[in-house]
């Protein structure tokens, strides 16, 4: 505890809000994955408080309404569909996701056939959808301090793991004597709902600051199975809000 206490001293000097009680009462939560399907494959990915899985599954659901085989993989139409599907996925994430211990995230509604059909119908193959229809977030400069690894051993055990410091070197505070960098994930909360000045942060009411709450992220460690249960892909990516696009 002594090194941690010294680390908190550095946090206080920078007007940080952490206390020893925050660390002593913290418990890692084991949550069920959210599951979608795409072209007869089952896609398992992370659910809230991460919004990355919601973004990814929304995009895959929308793309299933289009016959991508009709277009070349590197065609303008294919890239257009990917972009439009991801825009709608990020819209779901940014306005309806938060820590499920504090906010009722309507996962089943966001990923429902009705919602997907409604979103798919708004896509025009010949032009981009107006931003008034798909509420955008400003582009952010993503740091390179998220790491992802995917592992399968010779017995078939698989791990898809994403972890992050947030920005480069996290908060810039190291716990003395440990080499542990403290992250700056408080940055992933929405400071004020719908605040246009907060670049790229999810504006969902469920992602407001609150003691004990986990902020939204876009991490999306993913595993894909065929319907018979065989694992065919373990994937994920660093990249902040770009993670779902990298996986897709």
Pin down the residues of each PLM region:
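Single conserved hydrophobic/aromatic residue that forms the stacking wall/gate
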Residues: 1-12
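M16/insulysin-pitrilysin zinc metalloprotease superfamily fold
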Residues: 53-68, 224-233, 239-248
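Structured, charged N-terminal subsegments at the starts of enzyme catalytic cores
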Residues: 13-87
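Glycine-rich phosphate/pyrophosphate-binding beta-alpha loops
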Residues: 44-53, 150, 162-173, 237-244
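Short acidic-glycine loop/turn motifs at beta-strand connectors
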Residues: 38-39, 153-155, 225-229
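Internal maturation/activation junctions in enzymes
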Residues: 16, 66-165, 177-178, 185-186, ...
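Active-site rim segments in enzyme catalytic domains, especially the processed small/beta chain
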Residues: 18-19, 158-227, 233
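Short, small/polar residue-rich loop motifs at catalytic or cofactor-binding pockets
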Residues: 30, 143-146, 168, 217-219
